[in-house]
């Protein structure tokens, strides 16, 4: 029964993405993602929702504003094709992303939890997290390990960036607090 539910969710999600793509409002629609990046982003969101269905949770909804913020944070890495950039460059992108994200978060009454978001080390360099696993089993394992998707999260912002042939990702899940 769980497999049937998972398959149904994946089929419905895929059908919805096809319709939205045709209408110009798809996940990543209007963004600067390449077709390969959009496909990786869709695969990640589908895997997250399949995981949630297996836990008897509602599928999580992608929020366009939150995803735009994630895309802004990954943009300096994509533009330079590096997994390491100056902390100053990343802080600038992070400020821009937070300025976009914060009003939406307040409007929706949500708190957020980041996953695989770039971080700055003691040398003041910003680094990307792990690349997106290529194998489905590894992707499922990563999603289960992140833990926060087990919670009552209702929205997600996510983006991916292809850097030197590898897909890197960042996402932020949001749950209602008010």
What are these regions (language model features)?
Residues 91-178:
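A well-ordered secondary-structure block
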Residues 1-11:
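Bacterial N-terminal signal peptides that target proteins for export
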Residues 24-27:
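Bacterial signal peptide processing site
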Residues 29-102, 156:
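Short, well-ordered surface patches within globular domains
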Residues 10-13, 59:
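Enrichment for repetitive, rod-forming helical segments
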Residues 19-22:
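C-terminal motif of bacterial Sec signal peptides marking the signal peptidase cleavage site
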């Amino acid at each position: 029964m769980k497999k049937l539910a998972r398959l149904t969710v994946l089929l419905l999600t895929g059908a919805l993405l096809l319709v939205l793509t045709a209408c110009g409002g798809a996940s990543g629609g209007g963004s600067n993602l390449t077709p390969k990046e959009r496909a990786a982003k869709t695969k990640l969101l589908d895997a997250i929702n399949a995981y949630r269905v297996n836990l008897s949770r509602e599928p999580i909804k992608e929020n366009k504003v939150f995803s735009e913020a994630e895309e802004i944070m990954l943009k300096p890495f994509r533009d330079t094709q590096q997994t390491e950039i100056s902390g100053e460059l990343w802080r600038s992108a992070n400020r821009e992303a937070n300025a976009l994200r914060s009003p939406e978060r307040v409007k929706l009454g949500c708190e957020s939890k980041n996953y695989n978001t770039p971080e700055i080390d003691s040398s003041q360099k910003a680094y990307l997290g792990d690349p997106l696993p290529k194998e489905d089993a590894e992707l499922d394992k990563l999603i289960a390990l992140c833990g926060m998707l087990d919670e009552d999260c209702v929205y997600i912002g996510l983006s991916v960036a292809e850097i030197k042939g590898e897909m890197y990702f960042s996402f932020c899940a949001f749950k209602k607090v008010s």
